[in-house]
A protein has these predicted regions:
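ABC-type ATPase nucleotide-binding domains, specifically the catalytic core motifs of the NBD
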Residues: 15-17, 59, 92, 99-112, ...
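The feature captures the beta-strand-to-loop junction immediately N-terminal to the Walker
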Residues: 40-42
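Helix-to-loop junction immediately C-terminal to a conserved catalytic motif
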Residues: 55
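Conserved ABC transporter NBD signature motif
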Residues: 63-75
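Conserved ABC ATPase "signature" region
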Residues: 110-129, 181
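Conserved signature/switch motifs of ABC ATPase nucleotide-binding domains
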Residues: 132-135, 153
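Hydrophobic anchor residue at the start of the ABC signature
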Residues: 147
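Catalytic Walker B motif of ABC-type/P-loop ATPase nucleotide-binding domains
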Residues: 158-161
Length: 274
């Protein structure tokens, strides 16, 4: 069966007047349709670059990325992106922020579009906040708006670049369970970057473990835990075994040495948080 997303020998180097920095080297992995894939690795190893390559925002220096067999050659409309910060427009209310991609693309929105946006806000638990302004919302609520906006055009692929990292621990955990519920109700192919190993194991079907720069995929770990995963899942031995296995990659001598070297080049090492 043809993979939905395929990275084949992907490498990327950033060039500047002072230096060239290779961040990705021979990255290979496949993603099935509707699979939830989490990506963990040291800071500065190129995780976000992977997602920019997939979304067509940058062209890889080496190799190729394909979506359902077709090479990625530029920005794609079938990919939704949720950033670390939701970047809401402060002068627009919640509903208009969700509708902004359609307004920007077509210049107008229909009553059908508004009903669709309202249904998405209901799905993320914000049905009563359509007329609220961003500054009236908590951080978690703002991120829910960002998720609804990313889903507006019904993308085949959802890219999430550390979407919960700016939230407090309790809100972050709540948002993880909320994301799982949304994904289970209407599955998407998800690539999710996180520095939290436990968050990766809790949410993903598969975790990609990346090494220090120039990074490649050290291992693909299938997460065989039943869904829906709950707060009780966090207490299970199998869950603990997965997090321990992943964490050990970042304490191996070779990885520690390379990561420390990267830190001297102003690249922060992995923030080792479970």
């Amino acid at each position: 069966m043809q993979p939905f997303v395929s990275f084949s020998q992907v490498g990327h180097t950033y060039h500047s007047e002072k230096q060239s920095v290779k961040v990705l080297d021979n990255v290979n992995f496949d993603v099935s349709k509707h699979e939830f894939v989490a990506i963990v690795g040291p800071s500065g190893c190129g995780k976000s670059t992977l997602l920019r390559v997939l979304s067509g925002l940058i062209e890889p220096s080496e190799g190729q990325v394909r979506v359902f067999g077709h090479p990625v050659s530029g920005p794609r409309e079938d990919i939704g992106i949720v950033f670390q910060k939701p970047t809401l427009l402060p002068w627009k209310n919640v509903l208009d922020n969700v509708l902004f991609p359609l307004k920007h693309k077509f210049g107008h929105v229909s009553d059908k579009d508004r009903k669709h946006a309202q249904s998405l806000l209901e799905k993320v638990g914000l049905a009563d906040f359509t007329t609220s302004m961003p500054n009236e919302l908590s951080g978690g609520m703002q991120q829910r708006v960002g998720i609804a906006r990313a889903l507006l055009l019904n993308p085949d692929i959802l890219i999430m670049d550390e979407p919960f990292s700016a939230l407090d621990a309790l809100t972050r955990e709540e948002m993880g369970f909320e994301l799982q519920r949304i994904w289970m109700e209407k599955p998407k192919t998800v690539l999710f970057i996180t520095h939290s190993i436990s968050e990766a194991v809790l949410l993903a079907d598969k975790v990609l473990v990346m090494g220090p720069r120039p990074s490649t995929v050290l291992e693909e770990i299938q997460i065989n835990l039943p869904r829906p995963r709950t707060i009780n899942t966090l207490q299970e031995k199998t869950f603990s075994d997965y997090t321990t296995k992943i964490r050990e990659y970042f304490y191996r001598p070779a990885v520690m040495e390379t990561t420390a070297s990267a830190d001297k080049d102003n690249v922060a090492p992995l923030r080792r948080r479970a």
